[in-house]
């Protein structure tokens, strides 16, 4: 009945990483046990799936929950699962006002915009879900969400210039 061993089997059964062009899955946190010489009675695992396709995200979450339940039943462990939607993915057309405004601000600073869809979660997701079209502008961060994530001072200064151009254009 080692909860950590059951959790490790569940994680091993999950598909993690980039699953397709629109979908990622990750296990970001695991915690359990009280001491190295005590069989772990409890274990908490936090995982997520992100997709620009809501149905696809739901499928992946279901697979992860199923893997957890199966691993727990194999180890004769009890499992409690809760699923929480943190945000929804979104896409805006290039003709949307905030997309055009961001593109103009970037060009004004000598940067040709690159249009990409991302499964990232930010305040913008909440605004879009509430009916307010918002665009995220990349800030030059490298290796997002990795232990060695970084952004250069030059990239931050460039984003400040772009932000000032957006403010000036909206005045």
Put a short name on every predicted segment.
Residues 1-171:
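Metal-dependent amide/peptide-bond hydrolase catalytic core
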